[in-house]
């Protein structure tokens, strides 16, 4: 049960959702955030230059609920660039993330926020997630039906930005890099909570099923990491070693003007545009 004093003093949680051509799914994603048992939230939705009706859907949601704030990028730059836009506008003591084609358990934010508030040794936490087919069936990968979900990462906003700055603005794999950078730079825990609280829809065209960064899944449900992700992960690991040894700063500014480590050309963002706010 949640103590009375916790209910009376709940910190503001900023939820950052990036959107690109997700008009068909973003309503349910937004509703799963707004319907959370944890009520003290702001939802920042960042449209990454969608060509469908996503922006109109977002504006309609914002008109119905003043907890929703709509931001726009003027040029498509990828989900982690858009997440950084959200981070730069966020006001919450805690900040977390949500994709535009997924849904959360209705108590996800309450579970994570309470765990983080009561765990002074942790700078963040995340939950497990279940990947589902478009028909709602569980998808098994590498022998498991659920996996650690970095998309659910919740951090102490000011402490995290002071320690490591922002996400690397590449198009894939920057969430795992961010978590490991937090651990390396701060020596504090980013805890995996042993609960499935997030459900990801496996749709065609997602980051994990399309493009250079796509995972290849065989008939037995075994997923193989693509070369560009392996190259990026190894380059990030070497950079983290330098951070640990005190040879490099862990802070990535936003926007990023000079890379501290290698990223394959295929996953780098295009030229960045201005930011517009509703």
Q: Where would I find each of the regions flagged by the language model?
A:
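Nucleotide-sugar donor-binding/catalytic module of glycosyltransferases
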Residues: 1-277
